[in-house]
Amino acid sequence: MKRPTTYAFLAASLLGSSQGAILTFSDDFSGPLDEAWRQQSFEGGHLGISDGKYGLTANQGGGSNPKLSRSTAGELDSSYVNSVSVVFNEFGFGGDNTQSDFKWKNFGSEGFMEVVLNSFGDMRLFHNDFDGGGGNIQPNTRIAVANGDLLTLSNAYNATSDTIDFTYSVNGGDPISFYSGGGIDGPIGDTNTNFVEVEVFKWGASEFKPNIGIDDWSLKTSGDAVPEPSSIALVSLAGLFLLHRRK
C-alpha cells in the first residue's frame, strides 16, 4: 500500500513539471472575464465585456492608458503562435482621428516585442533585446484598415530557427505578411515567458476618444498540448484520489 507521502510526492512532481512550460490560453471573451487577466492603469478605460468583446478606451494624459495583461510564466521550450483579434469601433484611419496608439506587447526573459498601430493606419514592429539592442524591425507601414474592421494579428515563433513570421488579416481575409526574420541583433530570443499585454494610448488632444473591442486572444505552443498548471493539478489529484480509493 502506498503511503500518503508518496501521493503527495507524485502530485508535486506532476504539478512541478507543468510549471516548466509556457502557459497557453485561448479566450473569446464570451463570458465573465477570466481571473487570469489583469486590468491595469486607467480604471475608466476598462469597459468590460459586451457582445463577446472586451472594450477599452482612453483619455489623454499621464496614467490614462488602460492595459489588459496576462501572465505566461514558464520556460520557452517550443515554438508558439500568439494571436489577437480586435475590432476598432472608433479609432481614426481616415475618419475622426482619436490621435491614439494600439499596442500589443509580449515580454520574456531575454527581451520584449510590441506592435504599435496608430490612428493614421501606420503599423510598426519593435524588438528590444535585453543585451542592449532595441529598435523597429519593421518600420511604420500603412495597412488597409478602417473604423469597424476586425484586425487579426499573429506572431508565429519558430524555436528551431529563432525567428518569427508576423502576419495580419482584416475581417477574416487571407493573412498578409508583415515581417519575417530575426530580431534587432539577430536572434529573437525569449520574448514571451513573462506576460502579454494590450494597451490603448491616447497621445493627442483630439476630442475623439478611441474605442476598441478585443474579440479573441490566444497563445498556443506547437502541438497545443500544454494546459495551465491549475488544470494539470486537478487532473493529477483526481487520478491520485482514484488510485487511493482502489486500495
State each model region's role.
Residues 32-64:
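Extracellular glycan-recognition surfaces and repeat-rich motifs
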Residues 178-212:
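Flexible glycan-contacting loops in extracellular carbohydrate-active proteins
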Residues 128-152:
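Short, aromatic/His-centered strand-loop micro-motif at the edge of beta-sheets
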Residues 58-125:
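Secretory/extracellular carbohydrate-interaction modules
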Residues 20-28:
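Boundary/junction segments of secreted and surface-exposed precursor proteins
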